Each structure stands twice: as structure tokens, then as C-alpha cells.
């Protein structure tokens, strides 16, 4: 008899920060089945003292045809990578779509939408599985429009990047390099490194957040509830970890009034 597993996003508060995992339990016995921590060895400094982030707080999708579970991983904590990870590393698996074997919890593939993110960029948004005709061939794909403003189409079985296009005007990146799969960041986007305010064309809520998007096989279109807004990202020069604070290491009291997006 096949094992039935109930999967759940899981998060825990760690000194004002969030740590996360995806966990499974047998639906028959209730016993823990497997756990996958949403972190890897692409970090620097003593990031574990702050938790690191990586919450799986919203989207998970299951494809019965491929027998894969897709989880969307959240932002880093603190947001400011200079504080979180000594300004270094991609910080896997933050801001990533991760495919897992649902029977074992084993890693299959991942795609990171915002490597080394510093802007509260989550990839927890809805993950839609569909069959699309691309270049004359039907392909099984996953689609996501995460906070960072790009719309991604990936091969559902391998994670291969098929397309990545912005759905609105962005200021943190110009485009996604299709050869590397990485966003090409603008010089001013790394506010934590430049020491200057960065006027983002979207705020920490993102261009698209937890509001559902829809795909119509009849029209071949995806419908996304998108937002346009601005936000001044400024590194907090006086940041100290607190058990009762948001701990973003971003100065929410600052106003970059002289900086135009």
C-alpha cells in the first residue's frame, strides 16, 4: 500500500527572525515522515545566530503526473544581506522554487529568483503547473510571479528556465540573463553595499504577493493581480537584534525624498 504523506509549511521564530522547513507526516499513523531544511552552504558569517529566514509560508503545489512537490521559499531575515550573511553568497534556498520527492523529501531541483536577496523578495507566491505548447512541443511547466516583478516559466521536471520577463517597470534589475538564469541587478540596488538609499519601483509587498493568479488554457493567458509602488531601501546604521522588533536591518524611518525612482 502506498504511503500517504500530508505536507505542511513550517516556520519558527528564532530571536526575532524566522527559520523554516517543509515537513511531512503519515496520514495513517501521524508520525513524522521527512523534513527538508530550506538552507544550504551558500552563506557567510554567523548567519544562524539571526535565523536566516527562508519561510515556506504560502505556496506549495503537487504534480501527480511527475510526482513532484514544489515549495516556494521566502525572503532572508534580516532582509539586509550585509547583516544576515556578511554581504556574501546566494543564500540558498531563499527566494527559490524547490522541487522535492514527496515520498522521501529528497531534493530534486531548485531555481532561485533573487540570489542573495536584500529586498524581502519572496518566491512563496502561487506556483501553477500546466501544459504549454512551446516551439511546437507540449511541455509540462511551472509558472510563478514572485515579489521581484518577473514572471517565470520553468520546466516542471528539471527546473530549466524557459522564460523570465518583467510584468512591470523595475529598478532593482534590468532583465534575467537566460544563459545564467540570474537577474542582472542595477548598480544602485545593493543599498546595503553602496550606503546610499535605493528608490525601488516596488515596495516590500512586491509586484505580486499572496493574491492568487490564474491561468486559462482557453486564452493561453495568465492573469496576475499586480501592484506598482515605490519604497526607499536604506540600510539601518544602528541595527541591533531585538526579540520584539521586525529585525529587517532596513531603516523604515528613513525617507529618500531627494531620490527619484
Task: Describe each PLM feature range.
Residues 1-261:
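Beta-sheet-rich non-transmembrane sensory/scaffold domains
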Amino acid at each position: 500500500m502506498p504511503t500517504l504523506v500530508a505536507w505542511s509549511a513550517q516556520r519558527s521564530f528564532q530571536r526575532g527572525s524566522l527559520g523554516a522547513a517543509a515537513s511531512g507526516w503519515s496520514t495513517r499513523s501521524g508520525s513524522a515522515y521527512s523534513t527538508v531544511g530550506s538552507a544550504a552552504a551558500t552563506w557567510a558569517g554567523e548567519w544562524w545566530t539571526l535565523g536566516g529566514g527562508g519561510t515556506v509560508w504560502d505556496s506549495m503545489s503537487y504534480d501527480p503526473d511527475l510526482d513532484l512537490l514544489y515549495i516556494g521559499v521566502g525572503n532572508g531575515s534580516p532582509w539586509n544581506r550585509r547583516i544576515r550573511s556578511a554581504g556574501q553568497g546566494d543564500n540558498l534556498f531563499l527566494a527559490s522554487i524547490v522541487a522535492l520527492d514527496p515520498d522521501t523529501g529528497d531534493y530534486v531541483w531548485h531555481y532561485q529568483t533573487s540570489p542573495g536577496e536584500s529586498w524581502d523578495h519572496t518566491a512563496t507566491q502561487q506556483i501553477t503547473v500546466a501544459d504549454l505548447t512551446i516551439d511546437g512541443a507540449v511541455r509540462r511547466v511551472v509558472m510563478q510571479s514572485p515579489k521581484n516583478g518577473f514572471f517565470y516559466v520553468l520546466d516542471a521536471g528539471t527546473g530549466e528556465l524557459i522564460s523570465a520577463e518583467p510584468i512591470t517597470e523595475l529598478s532593482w534589475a534590468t532583465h534575467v540573463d537566460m544563459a545564467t538564469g540570474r537577474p542582472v541587478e542595477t548598480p544602485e540596488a545593493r543599498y546595503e553595499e553602496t550606503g546610499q538609499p535605493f528608490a525601488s519601483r516596488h515596495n516590500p509587498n512586491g509586484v505580486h504577493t499572496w493574491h492568487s493568479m490564474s491561468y486559462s488554457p482557453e486564452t493561453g493567458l495568465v492573469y496576475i493581480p499586480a501592484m506598482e509602488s515605490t519604497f526607499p531601501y536604506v540600510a539601518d546604521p544602528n541595527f541591533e537584534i531585538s526579540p520584539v522588533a521586525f529585525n529587517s536591518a532596513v531603516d523604515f524611518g528613513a525617507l529618500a525624498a531627494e531620490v527619484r525612482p
